[in-house]
Amino acid sequence: MKYPLLILTLIFCCGRDPLGTAEATHQNSSQSSASKASTQSIPAVDLQNARKAHDLLEQAIQALGGQAYLNVHDFDEQGRTYSFHHGQPTSNGMLFWRFVEYPDKERIEVTPERDVAELYVGNKGWELTYKGPHLIEAKDLNEYLRHRRFSLETVLHDWVNDASVALFYDGNALAGNLPADEITLINSKDEAVDLFLDIDSHVPIKKSYKWRDPVDRQLNIEEEIYDNFRMVQGVNTPYGFTRYFNGDMQTERFVNAVHYNEQLDEAMFDPNSGYNPNKPQKKH
């Protein structure tokens, strides 16, 4: 049984200045004279562009709640999700309960009885039913891991703090029909992510990236839209989420409630624990 993957980005942080290796080298007085000369050859306009991108990312963090946002360790949410194939709905939607503990634990429960779940811990995934845990098919697991690898929390927690990641401010753009500031991040593997920040509030309203299918070698584009932001426990939270695959709507999710830092029961992330969501949870 296959259920839609529900990836929502609700945490990222920013530490040291992530303007790329070039600027970091320029500011490091212990560098060799050759490295300094190389850095000084970079046009000032490029460094200014990277600084602009960095400053906008800082504004995005503040717009999402600042320190309250950075301090999120876990969260749970519930709502209704819809899946699509070639842009056409495949069902009337279903209820979901989602639990995330950073950096790599996630549980998604579906059906009104919450007796079917998908569980991801590290690089492994299981489907949980009354028959017990079963490993998720490799294709579906790889899809989930790709979404996590390019998720906002990964990009804006890990990439932004990686001195080898280059930042580019691409100027004004449209995210759907909304004006936005566009930023591109490129990591050391030459993987790129485009972020679109609301031009007024600075919250991220769109993310896109490309990847090549290892089987047919076709280039694919995935986009995520975030909307209907509400402040919850000091965290500016998107209650609306939509994913597009090569221009076609793939998943749409509407959140009804969110809670942060609830100290989730660790048993829910153990596929063999027999965890029952309908019994009172044990905090840890």
Cite the ranges covered by each PLM segment.
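Extracytoplasmic
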Residues: 72, 103, 162-164, 178, ...
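N-terminal mature ectodomain segment of secretory-pathway/periplasmic proteins
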Residues: 41, 48, 55-133
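Positively charged n-region of N-terminal signal peptides that target proteins for export
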Residues: 1-4
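Flexible, processing/modification-adjacent segments and terminal tails
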Residues: 49-53, 124-191, 214-218, 271-284
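Gly/Pro-enriched, hydrophobic low-complexity segments
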Residues: 178-271
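Post-signal peptide N-terminal segment of mature Sec-exported envelope proteins
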Residues: 23-52
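Generic structural signal for well-ordered beta-strand positions
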Residues: 90, 134-136, 205, 237
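C-terminal motif of bacterial Sec signal peptides marking the signal peptidase cleavage site
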Residues: 12-13
